[in-house]
Swiss-Prot record:
It is a multi-pass membrane protein. This is Uncharacterized protein MJ1221. It is found in: Cell membrane. The keyword Cell membrane applies.
Amino acid sequence: MWFGERMRYMKIIIPKKFLNTVEEILKKNNAYSISIIEPLKTSIEDGIIITCNADARDAEKIVLELKKLGLGEKGHGSVTIMPANITFSCREEGIASTSLSPLELYYKAKTMVKITKNVIIKVILASIMGVIGLIEHNIPTLIGAMIIAPLVDTVMGSAIGTVLGDKELFIQGMKKELLCSGIVIVCAFIPSLFFVSKELVLQYLSETSIILSAIVAIIAGISGGMSIASGKEYEIIGVTIDVSILIPALLMGMALATMDLYLIYITFILLAINIVLLDVGGYIGLKYKVGKINQKIKY
């Protein structure tokens, strides 16, 4: 049996008051590619449409739980199921909202917080390029490092967990964030033992304002949160987020190589402040967009 033949596309029409309950049912039963559509008119009063994909067995479980809500009874909506390989994406066709629902954000964040070999390899490569760029004062190399670094997901994953009130998701995001920062520090530390002096680190720190760096971090976080919640590509904004994590982490690795406690302390403070403010900014941006989505659904 082909993979596509085991997948089911589901179109669920329900009253708005059941949205949160249905979201929990879909989340529990591994549904994905979820979209929430608010049409001008449905077959039931004050109805919304939820579309998603699920494995055939999971789809059956979802239907059984929806029946307990009264789905199929008069005024309580309906569910349509068909093979997923003959359907199209409502979002791609412009039918669905361009903003992600809280449930869509949840599944997006679940992917973001995963620690994979590809992520670790990219962080290592970006760190090596980044420290070379700092040592040689090479701006293009630094920009290349920030484009490679997949650090935006580490920040936004934990921020989404905070907005959705999902403690486990937040913890997973923070673990990935700290792990990636640690990898950057180690990758910067090793070559810095041979090529970096205290004067070089002091030069960069003298050119860095903690206050201005903090402002950049919080703006980058807000922009990233709003872009992700809007369902838009966020790679360009991700470069700004990478600036706020990658460079401070690289500087800390370089400071560690000098064994100067003052430099280590300053770079640690810079990195810690940026990480916290990126998460705060991400929370603000996401909360703003998610709040607007919930307001639309409510009214």
